[in-house]
Structures are given as C-alpha cells and as structure tokens.
C-alpha cells in the first residue's frame, strides 16, 4: 500500500459494508494520488478509487464479498459431482484384496520394472513359475513375498487360493549404501549399492461363465500345467 500511495497528509476512509450500511469504520492512510489501488483489510478484498473521494477527503471502500460466495458455490458443485461419480463406480470389497510389502531389498528398482510388468495380471501359480525361471537375483525373496501374501489371503481372509491373481506389483526407491572400491597406486572410487521397497497386491478374481483361464495366461500356458512348485534343472518344460 505504501509503495502505491504518495503524500504526507492523512485521509479519513469511511468503510461502507454491503450488508449493513449503517455500520462504519475509520482508517487513516496518506493522501491518494494514484488512480486505482487495491488493498486487503483483514480477510476482505477492498478497492479504492480516486473518483470516490468526497469534499471531506472521505473515501468509500466497497467490500467485495462476491468472490467468497462464488467460491462456496463452486466447492458445493464440485462436491456434488464427486458424490455422483462415486455412486456410479463399483467398489471392490476390501476383504478380497491383500497387500504386503518387502522393505530394503538390495536391488535396483529400474531392473525390476520389466519383471513386474510381466508378473502383473498373472495367476499365483503362473507367477511362481515365472520367478523360478528368471535370472534376477532377488527372485527367491519375491517368491517368499508372494507366498506370504497367498497365506494371508487364504488363512486370514478366507479367499480361494485357486483364483488368486497378482493385480499389482511395484517398487519404490529406498536408499543407497556407499562403499569404497580400492584401485592401484593408492586410489579408490565410491560404489553405490541401491535398495528398494517392493509391494504386491493380490486379489480373488470373479468367476465368469465359460471362462477357460485365471489371470493373463492361466491354465492355457504350458508352464502352468507342468510346474508343481519346485524348479528342476533336469526336467524339460
């Protein structure tokens, strides 16, 4: 306000409210030489014009409460649209979904992205078969994570183990463990070992008339029918 107003003498401002014209309040500011200035008194935005100055150096300040009313109307309309959209969506029961996570896995999250894309949507037995064939080093820990999720789904939530599929599996960055790699002539460099967090979500697929598979591949894949839970290198798949 001080940057926009020049002068030394004080001017009495008379604030006229839209709701009650009788209630007034006085403000003292330097004399106005600008055409238009804006200032917020408290929580209400006001506008001061040179053309509104009276002979007694009184300025009427109009309180703009229309903005607050418009925002309230907009928020109310937004809530109504959200409620209508929420009623149209079909909610999945929480007792049909299991989420488990594995913290501080010593592997890069970027190297696991391709594997997780292949695992998402598979049935539980098919996912275990794929993890038995993969060359990723944390595949054994990932199999233990999926087995733990299947145990929770079957014994705690009472879900059918034959109809479990992996709906989502993702990884998040955790931290880097630093170490020193020594080289010749007294030199060395820093090694950063990445760690990540892995989360998996499994759910029970709904039964459909005439279905031939469970999950993305299900019983139509050859490895599903030949895999019995243990990988044997001498056996042909």
Curated annotation (Swiss-Prot):
Single GO cellular component term: mitochondrion
Primary location class: mitochondrion
Localization of this protein: Mitochondrion
UniProt superkingdom: Eukaryota
Cystine bridges: none
Molecular function GO terms recorded: structural constituent of ribosome
Gene3D superfamilies reported for this sequence: Ribosomal protein L22/L17
InterPro entries on file: Ribosomal_uL22, Ribosomal_uL22_bac/org-type, Ribosomal_uL22_sf
Gene Ontology biological process: translation
Keywords on record: Mitochondrion, Ribonucleoprotein, Ribosomal protein, Transit peptide
PANTHER family: CHLOROPLAST 50S RIBOSOMAL PROTEIN L22-RELATED (PTHR13501), LARGE RIBOSOMAL SUBUNIT PROTEIN UL22M (PTHR13501:SF10)
Family to which the UniProt record says this protein belongs: Belongs to the universal ribosomal protein uL22 family.
Protein name listed in UniProt: Large ribosomal subunit protein uL22m
Lineage: Eukaryota, Amoebozoa, Evosea, Eumycetozoa, Dictyostelia
């Amino acid at each position: 306000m001080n940057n926009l107003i020049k002068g030394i003498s004080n001017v009495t401002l008379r604030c006229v409210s839209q709701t009650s014209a009788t209630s007034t309040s006085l403000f003292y500011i330097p004399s106005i030489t600008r055409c238009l200035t804006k200032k917020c008194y408290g929580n209400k935005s006001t506008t001061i014009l040179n053309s509104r100055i009276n002979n007694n150096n009184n300025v009427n300040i109009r309180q703009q409460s229309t903005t607050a009313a418009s925002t309230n109307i907009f928020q109310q309309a937004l809530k109504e649209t959200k409620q209508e959209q929420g009623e149209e969506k079909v909610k999945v029961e929480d007792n049909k979904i299991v989420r488990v996570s594995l913290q501080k896995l010593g592997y890069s999250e970027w190297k696991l992205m391709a594997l997780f894309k292949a695992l998402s949507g598979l049935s539980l037995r098919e996912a275990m078969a794929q993890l038995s064939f993969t060359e990723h080093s944390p595949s054994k820990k990932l199999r233990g994570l999926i087995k733990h999720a299947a145990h929770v789904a079957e014994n705690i939530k009472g879900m059918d183990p034959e109809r479990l599929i992996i709906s989502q599996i993702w990884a998040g960055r955790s931290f880097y463990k630093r170490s020193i790699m020594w080289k010749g002539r007294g030199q060395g460099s820093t090694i950063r070992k990445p760690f990540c967090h892995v989360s998996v979500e499994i759910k029970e697929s709904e039964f459909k008339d005439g279905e031939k598979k469970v999950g993305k591949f299900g019983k139509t894949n050859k490895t599903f029918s030949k895999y019995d839970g243990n990988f044997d290198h001498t056996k042909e798949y």
